[in-house]
């Protein structure tokens, strides 16, 4: 048993070290801790039920040695002084006390003897004294119904032979209790680690975190805390209380007959069980206690199932909200892309407008340099349009007086050019123009826009070279003609060469 305890302790310490080196997720640890609590509660109830069953069916005829407390001694007399002395009894008692590894959970039975070594008569009830080992607070003694009346042994009288009165000390702790202490310490360490881990996370995370609600407590509700309502077939409702049964086995207690008559439709009670006043203990107490334990553990699991369902629903709500946010984000991105396309179109329109502004400014510059001369003189005074003013919208474009340009090229002013005969207006106008503004007649012997007349100038030679280069003649003939042109001297020879070249090109 000691080896098993040491094994469990070592495993617990290894688990604690591993948890300190690599902390687990708080949710996983809480689930493991809840499962461990349910398992430990089930094991404790199983041990209690097994101890009670063993105490009921144990043969109490086996004698056991008493356990002496620390620092005190207990003396017992042997049954036969002739064969067994007090020294042998003391040796057996000392051997029992020295063996600290022997711890029995069985029921102990004691015989009462007088000082002479004879068994005391009339104390049959003393045989039913029971000592429960394994308790921490001491030994509890149960006696028979007539123990205080029939017993002749007085614990307060001193022993005439000088022996000290027997002092029954507390029995050592059972291995099962020690094992549960180790598990309790292990659970406390795990809880401490969880608290430290949560404190560190709260200090490190300053932003928003998802706070998981704590696991609801698994305390059993009392009869006064949770009133419930039960529906019936009629309109009235009856209030009741919800409480768990403390008994693990036995018969159903009889219920008192109600004094009130039924106010609604009757309910069938064919499957109701008959009540029993007395029930003998059965061998299936362990099974019943185990069933009750499983029911209790199942009732403890139900709040955790509700908690898991709530947590699952919260997670689903969060997922739905995230999906909706994703969809909204996609819509926003689509609209932003359309805005970017519109921005490109707007930029192209702005570029076109800037180009048009440049062209308009260029046209305005050209118009500002124009001088449009609108003749305003020489009109018939009887003409109804003679006194009509110029369109005011055209004044910035015209920029000059209507008769200013004409007055500058005439010899006489406009006041002196009034003619009575309208038929002679054109002849008089020609004579009135200044000589330097009059056009000269076209001469046939000089070059003009009508024809080309070569002379001995360099310009004439350049024109002939251009005619030869732009012709459809071959390269050899072009080179030959160019060499002849270079050898020609004088205007007459150049004119003859030009006539010959024209004939060659026409053919």
UniProtKB/Swiss-Prot annotation:
Q: What InterPro entries has UniProt attached to this entry?
A: P/V_Pprotein_paramyxoviral (IPR004897), Paramyxo_P/V_N (IPR028243), RNA_pol_Pprot-P_XD_paramyxovir (IPR016075)
Ranges of biased composition (kind: Acidic residues):
137-160
Instruction: Quote the biased-composition stretches of kind Low complexity, using this chain's numbering.
Output: 236-252, 266-278
Q: How is it modified after translation?
A: Phosphorylation on serines by host CK2 is necessary for the formation of viral factories.
Chain intervals with Polar residues compositional bias: 279-301
Which keywords, in A-to-Z order, does the entry hold? Phosphoprotein, Viral RNA replication
Span list, region Interaction with the nucleocapsid (N-RNA): 459-507
Keyword Phosphoprotein assigned to the entry: answer is yes
Task: Look up the domain of life of the source.
Answer: Viruses
What information about domains appears in the record's comments? Answer: The N-terminus consists of a long intrinsically disordered tail. The central part contains the coiled-coil multimerization domain (PMD). Forms a four-stranded coiled coil structure. The C-terminus constitutes the alpha-helical domain that binds to the nucleocapsid (N-RNA complex).
Q: What is this protein called?
A: Phosphoprotein
């Amino acid at each position: 048993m000691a080896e098993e305890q040491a094994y469990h302790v070592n495993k617990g310490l290894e688990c604690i070290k591993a948890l300190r080196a690599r902390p687990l997720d708080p949710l996983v640890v809480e689930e493991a801790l809840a499962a461990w609590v349910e398992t430990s509660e089930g094991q404790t109830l199983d041990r209690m039920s097994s101890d009670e069953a063993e105490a009921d069916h144990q043969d109490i005829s086996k004698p056991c040695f008493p356990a002496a407390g620390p620092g005190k001694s207990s003396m017992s007399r042997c049954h036969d002084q002739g064969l067994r002395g007090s020294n042998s009894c003391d040796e057996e008692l000392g051997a029992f006390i020295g063996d600290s590894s022997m711890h029995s959970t069985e029921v102990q039975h004691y015989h009462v003897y007088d000082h002479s070594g004879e068994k005391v008569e009339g104390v049959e009830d003393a045989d039913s004294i029971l000592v429960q080992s394994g308790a921490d607070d001491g030994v509890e003694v149960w006696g028979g119904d007539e123990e205080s009346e029939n017993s002749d042994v007085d614990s307060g009288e001193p022993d005439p032979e000088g022996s000290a009165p027997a002092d029954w000390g507390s029995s050592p702790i059972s291995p099962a209790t020690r094992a549960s202490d180790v598990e309790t310490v292990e659970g406390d360490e795990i809880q401490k680690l969880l608290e430290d881990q949560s404190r560190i996370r709260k200090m490190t995370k300053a932003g928003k975190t998802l706070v998981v609600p704590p696991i609801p407590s698994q305390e059993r509700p009392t009869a006064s805390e949770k009133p419930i309502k039960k529906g019936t077939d009629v309109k009235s409702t009856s209030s009741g209380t919800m409480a768990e049964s403390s008994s693990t086995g036995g018969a159903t207690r009889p219920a008192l007959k109600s004094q009130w008559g039924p106010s609604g439709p009757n309910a069938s009670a064919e499957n109701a069980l008959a009540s029993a006043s007395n029930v003998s203990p059965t061998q299936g107490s362990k099974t019943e206690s185990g069933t009750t334990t499983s029911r209790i553990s199942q009732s403890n699991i139900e709040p955790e199932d509700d908690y898991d369902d709530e947590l699952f629903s919260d997670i689903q709500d969060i997922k739905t909200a995230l999906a909706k946010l994703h969809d909204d984000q996609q819509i926003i991105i689509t609209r932003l892309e359309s805005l970017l396309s519109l921005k490109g179109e707007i930029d192209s329109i702005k570029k076109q407008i800037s180009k048009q502004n440049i062209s308009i400014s260029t046209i305005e510059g050209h118009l500002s340099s124009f001088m449009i001369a609108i003749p305003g003189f020489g009109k018939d005074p009887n003409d109804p349009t003679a006194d009509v003013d110029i369109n005011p919208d055209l004044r910035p474009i015209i920029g000059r007086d209507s008769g200013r340009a004409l007055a500058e090229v005439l010899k006489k002013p406009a006041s002196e050019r009034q003619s009575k005969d309208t038929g002679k207006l054109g002849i008089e106008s020609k004579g009135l123009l200044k000589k330097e503004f009059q056009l000269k007649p076209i001469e046939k012997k000089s070059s003009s826009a009508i024809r080309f007349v070569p002379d001995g100038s360099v310009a004439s030679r350049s024109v002939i070279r251009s005619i030869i280069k732009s012709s459809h003649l071959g390269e050899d003939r072009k080179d030959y003609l160019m060499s002849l042109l270079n050898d020609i001297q004088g205007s007459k020879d150049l004119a003859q060469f030009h006539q010959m070249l024209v004939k060659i090109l026409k053919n």
